[in-house]
């Protein structure tokens, strides 16, 4: 039985969205308490989770804040960049596509 255009279109619409990691990068100027605050306010991390991720960023140079669809990852990246700029920090945030 041949697929109709509707069935083919429906199959295309049901694909899983690509997921993206949002990462914060370490620098020598951004205060660790500010990074923890970002993690709690923007990424909904608990205080313990925020502390653990902040230490990972400090020790390893970067840390994963969360995994989201593209639009959400980009929005969170913009929010973090804006908050860092408002507070005078050079905090960098990037996204990476999940394999």
UniProtKB/Swiss-Prot annotation:
It comes from the Bacteria. InterPro entries: ClpS, ClpS_core, Ribosomal_bL12_C/ClpS-like. SUPFAM superfamilies: ClpS-like. One of its GO terms (biological process) is protein catabolic process. Signal peptide: none annotated. Binds to the N-terminal domain of the chaperone ClpA. Belongs to the ClpS family. HAMAP family: ClpS. Involved in the modulation of the specificity of the ClpAP-mediated ATP-dependent protein degradation. This is ATP-dependent Clp protease adapter protein ClpS. The lineage of its organism: Bacteria, Pseudomonadati, Campylobacterota, Epsilonproteobacteria, Campylobacterales. The gene is clpS.
